[in-house]
Amino acid sequence: MNIILMGLPGAGKGTQASEIVKKFPIPHISTGDMFRKAIKEETELGKEAKSYMDRGELVPDEVTVGIVKERISEDDAKKGFLLDGFPRTIEQAEALNNIMSELDRNIDAVINIEVPEEELMNRLTGRRICESCGTTYHLVFNPPKVEGICDIDGGKLYQREDDNPETVANRLSVNIKQSKPILDFYDQKGVLKNIDGSKDISDVTKDVIDILDHL
């Protein structure tokens, strides 16, 4: 079972990824984890990726794609994987398609967690962090007992700069633009499964598991 998990920031991908790997014996493979593993193990591609990152440059697609191929070819991923954070561009989607053909495997489902933009704005702009202990709160989902004050140590709560409405709106806009051609690509292949991510977490999980159970 080879799955790609997609969704905009704030859609709850991390939560659903945890639930999927609890139910199915496949590794959750995120782009960040892949890079860290390749760099730590000092593979040729890992060294190459590190040299770009050390210079503050974007890692080129051919290096990223190579690292993905290495990772999904490992023993623990031979019976399937949950890919999160890749592909990010249509070129990467096409490259992944080629890799899967070379490995004589298929992408079985692309799970896309859909949440209305307004709801994502509420989720992402509501985060508050204690400036002394780092505890995270949410104004709607996990508010402090006293507004603006940490329950644990009485520290002042602040909003991260990248959680302000303007920054969040820009981030969502960029992500929507980037993800549309990828979603269209997988829709044409008949593997795109859209999930309503605005439901309760347990209901979203049930919908995801139902789809995967029927693959």
Curated annotation (Swiss-Prot):
The keyword ATP-binding applies. Residues 30-59 are annotated as: NMP. It is an enzyme of class 2 (transferase). ATP binds at G10, A11, G12, K13, G14, T15, R127, T136, Y137, K199. One of its GO terms (molecular function) is adenylate kinase activity. One of its GO terms (biological process) is AMP salvage. It is found in: Cytoplasm. Keywords: ATP-binding, Cytoplasm, Kinase, Metal-binding, Nucleotide biosynthesis, Nucleotide-binding, Transferase, Zinc. AMP binds at T31, R36, E57, L58, V59, G85, F86, P87, R88, Q92, R160, R171. GO terms for cellular component: cytoplasm. HAMAP family: Adenylate_kinase_Adk. NCBIfam families: adk, PRK00279.1-2, PRK00279.1-3, PRK14527.1. Belongs to the adenylate kinase family. This is Adenylate kinase. It comes from Staphylococcus aureus (strain Mu50 / ATCC 700699).
